[in-house]
């Protein structure tokens, strides 16, 4: 921001730009003015740098070391991709041949896939620098509680009712009032 203010000020205060826009002097005088301004510009950045330096932030080329920087996330990324690809096989298999094992596998896969997706959003959008130190921790704990409760509820439904795939099939089979009249 300070650089843009500096550049705007340089454009406004530049005598050559004023002369160029007004065209009140002949072209030969204009070129002399431009040359004089360019000679002064070589010395000017040193003086400006001393004034602007306290306002400018330090820029680092390397990434900052975070608390989790000691571990590699490659394994987690690989597992996330395997679970995502596995969903392509587990969901149809659970509907083709419904069983408690496939229902449980589908419940675990869907809940963990959703948990990782929402966790990525919490980490990205609930940064401590934006919302403070407490809210990211509360959001992450709430996400864990919701994920565990969802998985527990799905297991309860699988064990004590018709199962997940059959329950979804029954839900799809519900006909509305308009369908009965036709």
From Swiss-Prot:
A Pfam family recorded for this sequence: CybS
Mitochondrial matrix side: which ranges?
1-71, 123-135
Mitochondrial intermembrane face of the membrane? 97-101, 158-182
Q: Where does a ubiquinone bind?
A: 125
Matching InterPro entries: CybS, SQR/QFR_C/D
- Its Gene Ontology biological processes? mitochondrial electron transport, succinate to ubiquinone; tricarboxylic acid cycle
Please indicate if the UniProt record lists Glycosyltransferase as a keyword: no
User: Would you name any one GO CC term?
Assistant: respiratory chain complex II (succinate dehydrogenase)
Coarsely, its chief localization is: mitochondrion
Q: In which pathway does it act?
A: Carbohydrate metabolism; tricarboxylic acid cycle
Task: Select a single GO molecular function from the record's annotations and give it.
Answer: ubiquinone binding
Annotated heme binding lies at: 113
Q: Which residues cross the membrane?
A: 72-96, 102-122, 136-157
The membrane topology term of the UniProt record is: Multi-pass membrane protein
Q: Which UniProt keywords apply?
A: Electron transport, Heme, Iron, Membrane, Metal-binding, Mitochondrion, Mitochondrion inner membrane, Transit peptide, Transmembrane, Transmembrane helix, Transport, Tricarboxylic acid cycle
Q: Where can this protein be found?
A: Mitochondrion inner membrane
Q: What does this protein do?
A: Membrane-anchoring subunit of succinate dehydrogenase (SDH) that is involved in complex II of the mitochondrial electron transport chain and is responsible for transferring electrons from succinate to ubiquinone (coenzyme Q).
Self-association or partners: how does it assemble? Forms part of complex II containing four subunits: a flavoprotein (FP), an iron-sulfur protein (IP) and a cytochrome b composed of a large and a small subunit.
Family stated for the protein in its record: Belongs to the CybS family.
| Full protein name | Succinate dehydrogenase [ubiquinone] cytochrome b small subunit, mitochondrial
Organism of origin: Drosophila melanogaster
């Amino acid at each position: 921001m300070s650089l843009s203010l500096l550049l705007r000020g340089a454009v406004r205060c530049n005598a050559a730009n004023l002369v160029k826009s007004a065209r009140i002097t002949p072209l030969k005088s204009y070129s002399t003015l431009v040359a004089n301004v360019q000679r002064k510009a070589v010395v000017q950045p040193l003086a400006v740098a001393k004034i602007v330096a306290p306002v400018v932030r330090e820029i680092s080329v390397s990434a900052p070391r975070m608390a989790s920087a000691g571990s590699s996330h490659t394994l987690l990324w690989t597992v996330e991709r395997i679970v995502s690809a596995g969903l392509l096989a587990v969901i149809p298999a659970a509907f083709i041949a419904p069983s408690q094992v496939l229902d449980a596998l589908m419940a675990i896969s869907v809940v963990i896939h959703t948990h990782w997706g929402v966790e990525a959003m919490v980490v990205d959008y609930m940064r401590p620098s934006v919302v403070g130190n407490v809210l990211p921790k509360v959001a992450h704990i709430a996400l864990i509680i919701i994920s565990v409760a969802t998985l527990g509820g799905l297991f309860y439904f699988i064990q004590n009712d018709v199962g997940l795939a059959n329950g979804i099939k029954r839900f799809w089979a519900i006909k509305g009032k308009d369908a009965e009249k036709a």
